[in-house]
Amino acid sequence: MARFDIVLLIGLCLIISVFPDTTTAQLSRGFYSKTCPNVEQIVRNAVQKKIKKTFVAVPATLRLFFHDCFVNGCDASVMIQSTPKNKAEKDHPDNISLAGDGFDVVIQAKKALDSNPSCRNKVSCADILTLATRDVVVAAGGPSYEVELGRFDGLVSTASSVEGNLPGPSDNVDKLNALFTKNKLTQEDMIALSAAHTLGFAHCGKVFKRIHKFNGINSVDPTLNKAYAIELQKACPKNVDPRIAINMDPVTPKTFDNTYFKNLQQGKGLFTSDQVLFTDGRSRPTVNAWASNSTAFNRAFVIAMTKLGRVGVKNSSNGNIRRDCGAFN
């Protein structure tokens, strides 16, 4: 499990603190120190219980956090269930594949918090998701880091708001940079956060074109490692159920590490949006650097996750603390 020494942790705190933002001024590491002082331990225990039941909870929670923050900010709006009068974010086609185990991590942590009288209805679902995301990263061997707290839960969740706001598996670096820039994230942040694909799985439907019908000249994307392409074709043959799952990282799918970048160097990025990070000269130097230096990657990932957690934060004037993470109060 990755560990940072004290000097590195202090350095990260200093780097992160130099980016004050009026929209995130309310965030602090001790936000619940008086109202729910054991919030982190309670959430961590709930996360660990869930992971013991299924490892899917790890990548599912990490992906859920990203999808939440990139659509109207980190406000747990992705948790909201649709109603006859409103189609919520989670039911947009780009979110349909979000695994239920990620949602359940938040639900179980919320139950654990509410069973503590001093914490009942004190901690936002947005903060629960943020804490749980850090905890699943650590559980998979990734870096531990301090989490800023104080988010309020969003009051709006619509499927239409998702459209065009999430990266796609065929995106190039220009498209990726544009999406991340919109959320005040740099190219380096984008590359670091893309490495979340070191965990979990994707569905055959997302890679079918790349391995069977790439274009009029090549049936297989020529940037794919040939042996890896054959493996993918065997796992996802023509006419296969598009819901069949395949590992994002063919080498260490259950470990958070920098193998993701080593895979890209070998042409083993599952999505086009992964492999372009190596084939594009603008991002290749960073991929090469982090492939050979896990400490540098971990440092960049912590910074990127902290910045991501500041996107679109709600306060008491445009948010609240939900009693049920899946429904508005």
From Swiss-Prot:
Example of a GO cellular component annotation carried by this entry: extracellular region
Reaction(s) catalysed by this chain's protein: 2 a phenolic donor + H2O2 = 2 a phenolic radical donor + 2 H2O
Designated name of the protein: Peroxidase 35
Cofactor(s) the record lists: heme b; Ca(2+)
Biological role: Removal of H(2)O(2), oxidation of toxic reductants, biosynthesis and degradation of lignin, suberization, auxin catabolism, response to environmental stresses such as wounding, pathogen attack and oxidative stress. These functions might be dependent on each isozyme/isoform in each plant tissue.
Family: Belongs to the peroxidase family. Classical plant (class III) peroxidase subfamily.
Extra facts: There are 73 peroxidase genes in A.thaliana.
Site for Transition state stabilizer, residues: 63
Covalent S-S links between cysteines: 36-119, 69-74, 125-325, 204-236
Keywords: Calcium, Disulfide bond, Glycoprotein, Heme, Hydrogen peroxide, Iron, Metal-binding, Oxidoreductase, Peroxidase, Secreted, Signal
GO biological process assignments: hydrogen peroxide catabolic process; response to oxidative stress
PROSITE patterns from the UniProt entry: PEROXIDASE_1 (PS00435), PEROXIDASE_2 (PS00436), PEROXIDASE_4 (PS50873)
Residues annotated to bind Ca(2+) 2: 198, 249, 252, 257
Residues the record lists as binding substrate: 167
Keyword Phosphoprotein: no
Organism per entry: Arabidopsis thaliana (Mouse-ear cress)
